[in-house]
Amino acid sequence: MSLAAYCVICCRRMGTSTPPPKSSTYWRDIRNIIKFTGSLILGGSLFITYEVLALKKSLTLDTQVIEREKMKSYIYVHTVSLDKTENHGITYQARKELHKAVRKVLATSARIFRGPFADTFSTVDIEDHDCAVWLLLRKSRSDDRAARLQAVQEMSEARHWHDYQYRIIAQACDMRTLTGLARSKDSDLRFFLRPPPLPSLKEDSSTEEELRHLLASLPQTDLDECIQCFTALALSESSQSLAAQKGGLWCFGGNGLPYAESFGEVPSATVEMFCLEALVKHSEIPTHCDKIEANGGLQLLQRLYQLHKDCPKVQRNIMRILGNMALNEHLHSTIVRSGWVSILAEAIKSQHIMEASHAARTLANLDRETVPDKYHDGVYVLHPQYRTSQPIKADVLFIHGLMGAAFKTWRQQDNDQDLTEKVSEDETKYTTCWPKSWLARDCPALRIISVEYDTSLSDWRARCPTERKSIAFRSNELLRKLRAAGVGDRPVVWVSHSMGGLLVKKMLLEASKRPEMNTIINNTRGIIFYSVPHHGSHLAEYSVNIRYLLFPSLEVKELSKDSPALKTLQDDFLEFAKDKNFQVLSFVETLPTYIGSMIKLHVVPLDSADLGLGDLIPVDVNHLNICKPKKKDAFLYQRTLQFIRDALAKDLEN
């Protein structure tokens, strides 16, 4: 109305008034009309907009409670604001829109070319990464093995997901995918849920008593004599009686000869440790593994693992039991459901090589998707411990001596600094296992295996059958385990120290007599001997008291200078090696080894280390350090590396 009145007044003025002296008056009035009209329209628009927004706000319900319910609260650890504007900027929104556009293009292309496209989520308004998560989960269950492997690899490489998206996969993935993620080097630990709560112990019970009950529930008849002994000791009435029964006997674990410096000291044993050692032996029998699982052994072992985080020896024995149980595929689902994969996924990333290697063995036995081989107790893969796209072209096997170990025998040479301090140092300064730290980097196409044969039976030597400790028995047992691990399917180089070299010779001789083992003979490319007593050792003759403390009696007889068994082994091996196309390299010590503060002995002299084949290189070190290079560019390591590369040159080139 006001606008119409104003226009009428203006028209009357123009009609009744005399003509203006200037034409500018007319245009000034027009401009005033336009200004007034524009202001009126703009003000009205703002008012109407405000009223509409106010009305919409008053009619909108608060859905915060509903949104909270939609969050993955049961697995989402750290909550975030529901206001998307707080979390996502322009860059995120642009990337999101770009991803949507790409997905539409791919879907269109798939329709045009009639190709496969998972369009399950193409019409659903969800987060871009949520779509990727569910697509990967669907892909991980594909019937195509290559697609499953690719899905696991893509999951392990994810770095941009939210916390709840990792938890979605942890909650929704199957056993095969979870194991694959645990064996993927770059996997985020958020893929693995915490193990389920452990059942409460019975009233007035303890882990020690539960272990005894578990051990007592296992079959006690038709067992090996040594397993019966282990079980009887573990079921003794008290830890004091265990220590008394163990009294003064020697344990051949760890570093070997250095322990001889403390003849009068005997490690104190606990009931739990004895029970675990007995369970290790029982777990080598498949039917006993079923009993352990049925009687709650997996949960009990997990409780012990958590209670003894500061005791590596306890944890290693638990891992050995678990690795043995994982050899039985029908137990895989139970092992995964019990939460062990989460623990193993963390352990395999440990900086401590022994802990990581034990976890790697168990996970490899669980991973039937990519690992056809089975790793029995005492067979440890040092490289590769994760899934890898690197083709493995050859195997290098490390066999320690009688008083050695699968890891410590192959450590870097010790200095005056304490070994426990070295472990915490940077790996470039000191390594506790040079085959894993050095050789794996220099030759990534190798599978590196370290073997440990069971010498702990020497603790109860009076009750165990003597043939178990013979070179023949040990070699047959190791040969069986190595063949199960796929040794012989690829070219092989053997690396041995001390008595380990005698075992290698005996294994090759035994393999040559069995048609099913011929692949090991045909694929052997070379052997390295570090101070191997081919013709016996003076250590066995030095002193009756010392020799029985250092070696079980049968080993003393077999390692005696010019013993009949040793001579037969040497002659048979030379005859066997005549027409075989493999290389041989021998190192020998030139310095005596100190045993105690007043005794020093040249353990393997030059003439005993001479096999009669290949090169023999004297090195100015003692018997313990002959297989422990001082550093990576030391002669010992560089010559070993050169030999391995030369022996496998043709195989590594292919």
Curated annotation (Swiss-Prot):
Keyword Lipid metabolism: yes
Transmembrane segments: 32-54
Gene Ontology BP annotations: phospholipid biosynthetic process
Localization annotation: Mitochondrion membrane; Endoplasmic reticulum; Mitochondrion
Keywords (A to Z) from UniProt: Endoplasmic reticulum, Lipid biosynthesis, Lipid metabolism, Membrane, Mitochondrion, Phospholipid biosynthesis, Phospholipid metabolism, Transmembrane, Transmembrane helix
InterPro entries in UniProt: AB_hydrolase_fold (IPR029058), ARM-like (IPR011989), ARM-type_fold (IPR016024), SERAC1 (IPR052374)
Membrane topology: Single-pass membrane protein
A GO CC annotation given for this chain: mitochondrion
Family: Belongs to the SERAC1 family.
Biological role stated in the UniProt entry: Facilitates the transport of serine from the cytosol to the mitochondria by interacting with and stabilizing Sideroflexin-1 (SFXN1), a mitochondrial serine transporter, playing a fundamental role in the one-carbon cycle responsible for the synthesis of nucleotides needed for mitochondrial DNA replication. Plays an important role in the phosphatidylglycerol (PG) remodeling that is essential for both mitochondrial function and intracellular cholesterol trafficking.
Protein name per its UniProtKB record: Protein SERAC1
Organism: Bos taurus (Bovine)
Gene name of this polypeptide: SERAC1
